[in-house]
Amino acid sequence: MEEEFVVTPWEVRGRVDYEKLLKHFGAKPLTKDEVALLEKYAGEVHPLIRRGFFYAHRDFDFIMKWHGEGRPWALYTGRGPSGPVHIGHMVPWILLKWFSDKFGLEVYFQITDDEKFYDDPEMKLEEATNWAYENALDVIALGFSPERLHLIIDTKDIKPLYPIAVRVAKKLTWNTVKATFGFTDSTNIGLIFYPSLQIAVAFLPTELRREATPVLIPCAIDQDPYFRLARDIADALGYPKPSTLYSKFIMALTGESKMSASNPDSAIYTLDDEKTVRRKVMNAFTGGRPTAEEQRKYGGNPEVCPVFHYHMLFDPDDASVEKIRQDCKSGALLCGECKLKLHEKITKFLKEHRERREKARGKVDEYRLSVKLSK
């Protein structure tokens, strides 16, 4: 019998049933009506939405209508810096950049070195903060300007955040956070207070602009508990409720529901060299048959194949992706050839990304919010 899946902000285990998870969290599926609203205002729909990577939301229709009224809004997401960045981490950031470009929006990006320090018994605070700076390079490398991107490294940029977090904390009871996050008597008080900080960023643009400025938060579905609480207390604090857009997890190269830092071969990291990328891709699990002869005769199953999943991520051309799907199903495309095509796409992306990443080194402070506010 298959183990029941587990999804929390700190752990994802088992084969995730996304529809069941949606019902459990109480978020709404992203329908063609919301997608049509986005297309109306953006002029197009990003492939990550079109292809179903982002599949659920809270009040996405509200933020689109708010935009239609010409009112201000902003973007928010984040990263827990527990180690190097892999491609799965970057999926919400890529969509974030697209929204920023399409709608001319400022981006608030929280890097939670404090949370990772609290959560990992072996993690030193200095190590978490060093990873925060390293991970920030991957965010900047997506092409954000310092005018648009506001980085918040929690231990370095707490000043504008803390007064809001204090007000948030006063509205959250122990019973509420215990029930929401599964905290126990052995949970350290850092983790218990931490949700106040992640929620606070959702209200920060309103404070800074001194007018109602709701945020749209593209993130993985496991972050929903934080923003459910944010929405529950927003009215009482006089802030607009944040809207959210939730993604599925990026399938592991090994075939599991989610990439895992505990198994480096399950993911492609931005710092992986070409040889490592090639090895990981060529060794990846597939939806193909055991032999080339059977593949040609019966075809493969792209829907369970991480290699096809990655083609959907890296190929912007719908016709090209559909051809790979059909050629796999018909047996015209063998797994080895499909993997080589993917390796080429990933190598090109990472080469360009790493060049931009190195150019960003030494410039992180130009993007930090507290540095900008102190000038």
From Swiss-Prot:
Q: Which InterPro entries match?
A: aa-tRNA-synth_I_CS, aa-tRNA-synth_Ic, Rossmann-like_a/b/a_fold, Trp-tRNA-ligase, Tryptophan-tRNA-ligase_arc
What Gene Ontology biological process does one annotation of this record name? tryptophanyl-tRNA aminoacylation
Motif 'HIGH' region: which ranges? 81-89
Please report, in chain numbering, the residue ranges of the motif 'KMSKS' region.
258-262
Gene Ontology CC entries for this record: cytoplasm
Where does the source fall among the domains of life? Answer: Archaea
Q: What is its EC number?
A: 6.1.1.2
Q: Spell out the subcellular localization from the entry.
A: Cytoplasm
- CDD domains on file: TrpRS_core
Q: Quickly give the catalysed reaction.
A: tRNA(Trp) + L-tryptophan + ATP = L-tryptophyl-tRNA(Trp) + AMP + diphosphate + H(+)
Give the record's keywords alphabetically: Aminoacyl-tRNA synthetase, ATP-binding, Cytoplasm, Ligase, Nucleotide-binding, Protein biosynthesis
- Molecular function in Gene Ontology: ATP binding; tryptophan-tRNA ligase activity
Does this entry carry the keyword Nucleus?
no
Q: Does the keyword Transport apply?
A: no
Please name the HAMAP family in this protein's record: Trp_tRNA_synth_A
Membership in a protein family: Belongs to the class-I aminoacyl-tRNA synthetase family.
NCBIfam families, per the entry: PRK12285.1-4 (NF008927), trpS (TIGR00233)
Q: What is this protein called?
A: Tryptophan--tRNA ligase
Q: Which organism is it from?
A: Pyrobaculum aerophilum (strain ATCC 51768 / DSM 7523 / JCM 9630 / CIP 104966 / NBRC 100827 / IM2)
Q: Which lineage ranks, top first, belong to the organism behind this chain?
A: Archaea, Thermoproteota, Thermoprotei, Thermoproteales, Thermoproteaceae
Q: Please name the gene that encodes this protein.
A: trpS
